[in-house]
Amino acid sequence: MSKLDLNALNELPKVDRILALAETNAQLEKLDAEGRVAWALDNLPGEYVLSSSFGIQAAVSLHLVNQICPDIPVILTDTGYLFPETYRFIDELTDKLKLNLKVYRATESAAWQEARYGKLWEQGVEGIEKYNDINKVEPMNRALKELNAQTWFAGLRREQSGSRANLPVLAIQRGVFKVLPIIDWDNRTIYQYLQKHGLKYHPLWDEGYLSVGDTHTTRKWEPSMAEEETRFFGLKRECGLHEG
């Protein structure tokens, strides 16, 4: 696999970019997660960043990538509406793994947003998308720009939802390379990795949560529910960071 030219690839239409990365992705599918991270560090341009929502299984990608690329900036987009357990989990993992945490927030506070727009998450898909644009997408775009990111690692997995089922290991999103080292891992592999390295699930895992985001748009899993139905009232799965 040869080195890739980000600028040249960004000039191509999306379909052509996918085709241009197809051969590389075929080779990356044969590597394990650690091998994919190592390949990216050898063949893709820096600066490198890792994003995390500090959700249920976040410790896996945080540990895996940080072990191979110590001190990599870890981007968290904080909406101000995370569970108290999430904030404590962030503190715990940041200390345990010695993370180089970079927290980004909307330019408007949560209280100001509610005064201006009301509770956007109660305003259907359109309201949720506006909320996500303000609190997730814009802060992430700002983070990528300020950190001069050219390669972005994330912990998405195909098993998590239909919207992620066909994602490749390597893509281009928001003008940068995006690498998903554990994209093909199943829940059993996640569990085994956590056990092997003495890591924990998010505290709310034990209370029946399969996915954790904001307090107002996260539900406990119930029998007959798909995992994606536990977020955004089942109206959508993605918060906007991993779309487009």
Swiss-Prot record:
The keyword Translocase does not apply. One of its GO terms (biological process) is hydrogen sulfide biosynthetic process. Keywords: Cytoplasm, Oxidoreductase. GO terms for molecular function: phosphoadenylyl-sulfate reductase (thioredoxin) activity. GO terms for cellular component: cytoplasm. Pathway: Sulfur metabolism; hydrogen sulfide biosynthesis; sulfite from sulfate: step 3/3. It catalyses: [thioredoxin]-disulfide + sulfite + adenosine 3',5'-bisphosphate + 2 H(+) = [thioredoxin]-dithiol + 3'-phosphoadenylyl sulfate. It is found in: Cytoplasm. InterPro entries: PAPS/APS_Rdtase (IPR004511), PAPS_reduct_dom (IPR002500), PAPS_reductase_CysH (IPR011800), Rossmann-like_a/b/a_fold (IPR014729). Its EC number is 1.8.4.8. The active site is at C239. Catalyzes the formation of sulfite from phosphoadenosine 5'-phosphosulfate (PAPS) using thioredoxin as an electron donor. Belongs to the PAPS reductase family. CysH subfamily. This is Phosphoadenosine 5'-phosphosulfate reductase. It comes from Shigella dysenteriae serotype 1 (strain Sd197).
